[in-house]
Amino acid sequence: TVYDVTMKSFEGETIRGYWAVPKGKKNYPAVITYMGYGATPWTPDVNTPECAKMAEFIISVRGQALNKEYNKYGDWFTYGMSKKETYYYRGAYMDVIRAIDFVYSREAVDKTKIFAQGGSQGGAFTLVACALDDRIAAGAPHVPFMSDFVDYEKLGKWIGAALRGEAKKQDVELSKILETMSYFDIKNFAGKIKCPIVMGVGLQDIVCPPHTNFSGYNLITSPKEYYIYPKNGHSLPIKEWFKVRENFFDKFL
């Protein structure tokens, strides 16, 4: 069964997602899927083997995808970047936690087996979820975004241009923008992660370069492992990575 979920998050923001539950089961595990930047969630296929053994909550954070009708931000990445209190990702990170609240509130969910997964922006959200909320039992990010902004500015064409452009727009030094970004940098969350992690990396990724993936990963002190795909960029071979992820979560079922 698939449900269309609408709920309120931090500062009264409306967010939506899809909640798929296994038929005829109780006390089932659940995985939260965090989406990439602006990516539209797919409707979960309840006929897959994965959906038969665990529930899935696919969530769109504020203003993105399922929530575009509520979008007041314009460009999400740069919105409110002048201050940590107004920056878009302050609210988006709270939406990440709100998704956990929803899953945890479901009576039929095994509260000890809630997992997180996602790629790019969703990979960053996965790591944030694991760092900020010990209700997550294990996480599987791939090609994670939002990590090591000092080097991102040099390595990431789009990110570098956005950061420099915002500094010019605000007529401030780039260091001022990077100071704001430090509050949302995955590097500064990684040390708080206590659950097991598996990470997938595309060695040819120019959007979220491998260097930035590992800058956060290397600071994780909990059990961790990674898989490198030498020929892939910002997308991994789906069947291969999904199998890695499935096998990883199976260890905790």
Q: For each of these PLM feature ranges, what is it?
A:
Residues 123, 127-173, 228:
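Hydrolase active-site cap/lid region
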Residues 17-21, 27-38:
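Short beta-strand element of the alpha/beta-hydrolase
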Residues 226-244, 248:
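Histidine-bearing beta->alpha loop at or near hydrolase active sites
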Residues 192-193, 199-201, 205:
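Short beta-strand/loop motif that positions the catalytic acidic residue
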Residues 42-94, 151-160:
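Cap/lid segment of the alpha/beta-hydrolase catalytic domain
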Residues 203-208, 235:
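Acidic catalytic loop of the alpha/beta-hydrolase fold
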Residues 77-120:
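Gly/Ser-rich "nucleophile elbow"/oxyanion-hole loop immediately N-terminal to the catalytic nucleophile
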Residues 1-25:
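N-terminal cap/lid segment of alpha/beta-hydrolase-fold proteins
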